[in-house]
Amino acid sequence: MFQPAPKRCFTIESLVAKDSPLPASRSEDPIRPAALSYANSSPINPFLNGFHSAAAAAAGRGVYSNPDLVFAEAVSHPPNPAVPVHPVPPPHALAAHPLPSSHSPHPLFASQQRDPSTFYPWLIHRYRYLGHRFQGNDTSPESFLLHNALARKPKRIRTAFSPSQLLRLEHAFEKNHYVVGAERKQLAHSLSLTETQVKVWFQNRRTKFKRQKLEEEGSDSQQKKKGTHHINRWRIATKQASPEEIDVTSDD
């Protein structure tokens, strides 16, 4: 059994690698993590032994105060020749030389960045039904995303008719529910409207007329049913027969 290393107090001076007064007996023994001392006492793991030897050599040369140099040299020695380990540059070198924007860390991520349909699985399903609205030879999903807002059919603007125009249109509708051809053209010219505006107004007016007619017929039938129901209840209460049940016979 090996004795555990005594606890050491890490001060700010030791962390920032400033010179601090040390006893003469410990001047040649630099402060290092306890894991390195454990690795030195156990010859089972060759990787830890190699790491410890590299750190000890760096400490003997007096460069242990620079963590970047110790880290680079310790990693640059591969423990196993069959598995090469590339030296890792210090963090400030990585920050000074960032990766280019076009470089992708993995080909899978690059394919997802180039193809927006992978992020929107519903895109292809909608694109099959809306592809006929595009113009040109570009029928890619990117074109769908760019031109989808422009490819929508614009909403029809409702025409604000003046009271005099509405009065003339109502008179024309009372005469004829369908105005076509030269009559519609003449009516539109007299009202300073287009033929399309007159056509749409007559379509809406016919729809309104049919709805009003159905509502009137429905209300009349309900009134008749209510009246018949009250008459039948009165006959049942007074025990009077209906006109169909009365048999009129003459004495002759």
Swiss-Prot record:
InterPro entries: EMX-VAX-Noto_Homeobox_TFs (IPR050877), HD (IPR001356), HD_metazoa (IPR020479), Homeobox_CS (IPR017970), Homeodomain-like_sf (IPR009057), HTH_motif (IPR000047)
Any Pfam family: Homeodomain
Family annotation (SUPFAM superfamilies): Homeodomain-like
Annotated stretches, region: Disordered: 212-252
SMART domains registered for this protein in UniProt: HOX
Subcellular location: Nucleus; Cell projection, Axon
Ranges of the DNA-binding region feature: 154-213
Keyword vocabulary terms for this entry: Cell projection, Developmental protein, DNA-binding, Homeobox, Nucleus
GO molecular function: DNA-binding transcription factor activity, RNA polymerase II-specific; RNA polymerase II cis-regulatory region sequence-specific DNA binding; sequence-specific double-stranded DNA binding
Tissue: Cerebral cortex.
BP terms from Gene Ontology: anterior/posterior pattern specification; brain development; cell proliferation in forebrain; central nervous system development; cerebral cortex regionalization; dentate gyrus development; forebrain cell migration; neuron differentiation
Stretches with biased composition (Basic residues): 224-233
GO cellular component: axon; chromatin; nucleus
Recorded family membership: Belongs to the EMX homeobox family.
Disease / disorder: Schizencephaly: Extremely rare human congenital disorder characterized by a full-thickness cleft within the cerebral hemispheres. These clefts are lined with gray matter and most commonly involve the parasylvian regions. Large portions of the cerebral hemispheres may be absent and replaced by cerebro-spinal fluid.
Subunit record text: Interacts with translation initiation factor EIF4E.
Function: Transcription factor, which in cooperation with EMX1, acts to generate the boundary between the roof and archipallium in the developing brain. May function in combination with OTX1/2 to specify cell fates in the developing central nervous system. In the inner ear, it controls the distribution of GPR156 at hair cell boundaries, and regulates the organization of stereociliary bundles in opposite orientations across the line of polarity reversal (LPR).
Name recorded for this polypeptide: Homeobox protein EMX2
Lineage summary: Eukaryota, Metazoa, Chordata, Craniata, Vertebrata
